[in-house]
Amino acid sequence: MEVFNIFPTTVYVGEMTKHDQYKKNFYDVYHKFDYEEDDVNNTVSENVGNPLIHHEDSLEELFSEVIHHVKTYTLDVLKYKNIFDYIITKTWLSRSRDEKSIPWHLHACAHISFVYYVNTPPKSHKLKFMNPHHKNSLWLGNKEGKYDHLKMIEEHNEVNAETFFIHPPEGHVALFPSTLHHSTESIEGFVGERLAIVGDVSCVLKKEYLQFSTGYINPQYWKIYQG
């Protein structure tokens, strides 16, 4: 017998080498990106009009290391050719102070998204991903179920699950395809503030690569017209 598990979705988690320094540097500028929580802006700061954390000079080394992980993910894990430059297009805060969770969503305008875990108290919210294929569910709607006697699957694993969650520890960065649906889920007993820097990365071809029929050519060749 042979079994082939094909077309996996790959999520990457890597350790940031100077986390203590990066954490201090961020808390020094945290006040610039803090936001008033309301019904719209509670778990993320993306929509408050200041998604520009990556432009802070004191955080340059932090984001350079994030891009180092992005390059490892792209070149060593996904095995792309070394033909890309990497652009951080926007960055914002993901913050949880209570049981509120981030609903299912994706980042349609980017290639790779990252979450850098700056502060993670015990029982911090977990990061969940949705299976984009569902082929091993055999039919849609075959969910995990709330009651044992209504579950059809004996053991949930990476082969048959419709969702998958991870708990990246503080000082680590998680990378995943931006179009992969993801969310967060609270854990009972959580106290404190889970804080992460979230960002989107676009892969653009290096300036010498103009022969490809797909992908973004280097922005130095773009011409922007005022709207």
What are these model-derived regions, one by one?
Residues R97-V173, E185, E193, I197, ...:
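Catalytic core of non-heme Fe(II) oxygenases with the double-stranded beta-helix
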Residues L180-S186:
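Low-complexity, intrinsically disordered Gly/Pro/Thr-rich segments
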Residues I87-S94:
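A short glycine-rich, His/Asp/Glu-containing loop-to-beta-strand
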Residues E37-D38, H134-K143, I217-G227:
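Short, cationic low-complexity segments
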Residues M1-N82, S94, E99-S101:
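Non-heme Fe(II)/2-oxoglutarate
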Residues L175-T179:
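Short, proline-centered helix/strand-breaking motifs
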Residues V118, L180, V201-C203:
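Short beta-strand segments enriched in hydrophobic/aromatic residues
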Residues K128, V201-G227:
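Double-stranded beta-helix
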